[in-house]
Amino acid sequence: MEITVEFFGLPRRLSGVKETTVEVKKGATLRDVVKALAAKFPSFLGDLINPETYELEPPYFFNVNARYVPRSLEYQPKEGERLLLLFVEAGG
């Protein structure tokens, strides 16, 4: 199935694109999406994605359809869902 991922900040700068699509098997988890992103954009490894665990490095996280933030990478996105790869930013 095809999942669209929109990038903001560093992910957008490293990838050179605003968004991309990745192909994953039905029933795939966000971790599978992360692995697909790492394969497509090796520059994500290190700063954005831990190359050993395929966890997103803090402060990065996924938002689903601009409505929901999954608590773990075991969330199974559905066909056609749009993932936003965001980062937590604090200021004063």
What do the PLM-derived regions correspond to, one by one?
Residues 1-91:
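Ubiquitin-like/PB1-type beta-grasp interaction modules and other compact soluble beta-rich domains
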